[in-house]
């Protein structure tokens, strides 16, 4: 156990520790209370009103005491003032007073009565009598003077004030520069005395120039002189200013035009870039006029069939050669143009295929063959043979110039007028075997005219009497058969040739060349519903058309 301390331990003082004592806080004075007392001690001020200004003007105008003007005492009652006003109004009224100043005197009388009959305004007038009017030390004095000035006087006063203010500003600028120069000079002198830093020679030269430039304001620095000098200089420089303005306007116009041209070129370039594909201009189609046949030699019907066959064979060979050489390939655009032209020139229009060929820039044969191919590819009528099959058979049969029979696939079916069907004549036993083997396949019906020709009996002697002929049944049947044949030929001649029949005729002419046996009979068998005479007549017509085309080209 430790013994208890007899004396408490003493801490070292602040000075022993080396600490600086804090300064005592400053005494707090009640500044807020002082400000409040000052504000409360300020007396309320009263501003001047329009009534006061009118009263000041009336006092200056009358130049007399209002009580003396009415002839009453200053402490008179309102009744005494009213009586005095009535008496003076009877004497000073303009109708009874012939004096020149009667109107002004009567107006002053009314104004004095209006002031004295009101207690408040009378009290203000009594204060003016004691204290007098406001003097130059009060702002209302100048305000009253300015109110009475005209516009010209106000403008002159304002101009004088501005002139004085401008001159004072000029002097203030001069004095400020002088002060700056003086301070800078003192600094330079101090630097020279101390010698701590070298003084720059260029700065000294600049300070000397500034001293020379500093000049006291002269009379021509006044505002009126400055305005006059500025006006003269503007008049002198006015032509140059106008010229500069014209040049500036011309440059502005040129820039605007250039901007417009640039904008147009940009828009054109943008449109050209946007146009990916330029549409072809539609050609102007000439009005089709059929060729006049007056200058074309008519067909000589006296020519032999051999000459006609030679001409037709030459024409077919030339047409095939030109088609192989000149016919370009058909593109999708050409096909679409062909369909549009076929819609534009429907069937029945004169010179339809010539117009379509002129529009496409191709030959008539090329256009017709392509149109036929399109029709065959879309639809194929029952009972007819496809042109592609016929062409393939023709091309395969060309190198072999021997007369061969058509295969069963290419044999067309047809019905005669009476609806009687007969099998084709076959040579020998092989024909009978083929007919037995091909019963399931489509079989060609034999025309009625061939049956009639085979079943027809040989003509008897022409010297038989007419009476006996009338009673002969065979002769009557023969005459009726001849009439029916004539009617059928006339009907078939009247029927128009279709495109399929025309194509079959052309293919048959190529398949059975000139010199083959029974050529026209075989050709007539290939063309449905057409006889041998019809095929020959059509052949002659085609030859005539070829001759006309050759003459037209030459």
Swiss-Prot record:
SANT domain segment(s): 325-379, 492-547
Subcellular location as annotated: Endoplasmic reticulum membrane; Nucleus membrane; Microsome membrane
Keywords, in A-Z order: Chaperone, DNA-binding, Endoplasmic reticulum, Membrane, Microsome, Nucleus, Phosphoprotein, Repeat, Signal, Transmembrane, Transmembrane helix
SUPFAM superfamilies according to UniProt: Chaperone J-domain, Homeodomain-like
Lumenal compartment segments: 48-153
Phosphoserine PTM sites in chain numbering: 381, 430, 479-480, 484, 492
Keyword Iron: no
Chain ranges passing through the membrane: 154-174
Region (Disordered): 392-500
One function term, GO molecular function aspect: protein-folding chaperone binding
The keyword Repeat appears for this protein: yes
Lipid bilayer topology: Single-pass type I membrane protein
One Pfam family matching this protein: DnaJ
Sequence ranges assigned to domain J in this UniProt record: 65-129
Bias kind Polar residues: ranges: 392-405
Protein name: DnaJ homolog subfamily C member 1
Species: Homo sapiens
């Amino acid at each position: 156990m430790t013994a208890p301390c007899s004396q408490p331990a003493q801490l070292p003082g602040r000075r022993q520790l080396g600490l600086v004592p804090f300064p005592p806080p400053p005494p707090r004075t009640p500044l807020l209370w002082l400000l409040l007392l000052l504000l409360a001690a300020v007396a309320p001020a009263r501003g001047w009103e329009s009534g006061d200004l009118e009263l000041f003007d009336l006092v200056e105008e009358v130049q007399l005491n209002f009580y003396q003007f009415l002839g009453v005492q200053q402490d008179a009652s309102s009744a005494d003032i009213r009586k005095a006003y009535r008496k003076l109004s009877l004497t000073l009224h303009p109708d009874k007073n012939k004096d020149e100043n009667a109107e002004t005197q009567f107006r002053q009388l009314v104004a004095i009565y209006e002031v004295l009959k009101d207690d408040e305004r009378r009290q203000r007038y009594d204060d003016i009598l004691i204290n007098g009017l406001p003097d130059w030390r009060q702002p209302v004095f100048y305000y009253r003077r300015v109110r009475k000035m005209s516009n010209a006087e106000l403008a002159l006063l304002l101009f004088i004030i501005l002139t004085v203010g401008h001159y004072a500003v000029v002097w203030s600028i001069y004095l400020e520069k002088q002060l700056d120069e003086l301070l800078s000079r003192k600094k330079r002198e101090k630097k020279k005395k101390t010698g701590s830093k070298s003084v720059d020679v260029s700065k000294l030269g600049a300070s000397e120039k500034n001293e020379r430039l500093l000049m006291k304001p002269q009379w021509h620095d006044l505002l009126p002189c400055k305005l006059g000098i500025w006006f003269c200089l503007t008049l002198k420089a006015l032509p140059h200013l106008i010229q500069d303005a014209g040049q500036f306007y011309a440059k502005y116009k040129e820039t605007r035009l250039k901007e417009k041209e640039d904008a147009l070129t940009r828009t054109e370039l943008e449109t050209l870039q946007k146009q990916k594909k330029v549409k072809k201009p539609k050609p102007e189609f000439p009005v089709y006029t059929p060729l006049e046949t007056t200058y074309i030699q008519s067909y000589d019907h006296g020519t032999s069939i051999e000459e006609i066959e030679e001409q037709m064979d030459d024409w077919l060979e030339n047409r095939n050669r030109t088609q192989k050489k000149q016919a370009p390939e058909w593109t999708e655009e050409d096909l679409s143009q062909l369909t549009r032209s076929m819609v534009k020139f429907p069937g029945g229009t004169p010179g339809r295929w010539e117009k379509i060929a002129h529009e496409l820039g191709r030959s008539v044969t090329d256009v017709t063959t392509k149109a036929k191919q399109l029709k065959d590819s879309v639809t194929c009528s029952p009972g007819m043979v496809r042109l592609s099959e016929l062409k393939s058979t023709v091309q395969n049969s060309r190198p072999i110039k021997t007369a061969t029979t058509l295969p069963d696939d290419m044999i067309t079916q047809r019905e005669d007028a009476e609806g009687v069907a007969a099998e084709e004549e076959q040579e020998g036993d092989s024909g009978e075997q083929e007919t037995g083997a091909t019963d399931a396949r489509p079989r060609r019906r034999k025309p009625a005219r061939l049956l009639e020709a085979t079943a027809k009996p040989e003509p008897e002697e022409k010297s038989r009497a007419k009476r006996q002929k009338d009673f002969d049944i065979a002769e009557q049947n023969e005459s009726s058969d001849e009439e029916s044949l004539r009617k059928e030929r006339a009907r078939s001649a009247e029927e128009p040739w279709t495109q399929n029949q025309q194509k079959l005729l052309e293919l048959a002419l190529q398949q059975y060349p000139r010199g083959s046996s029974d050529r026209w009979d075989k050709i007539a068998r290939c063309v449905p519903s057409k006889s041998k005479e019809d095929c020959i007549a059509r052949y002659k017509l085609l030859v005539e058309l070829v001759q006309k085309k050759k003459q037209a080209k030459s």
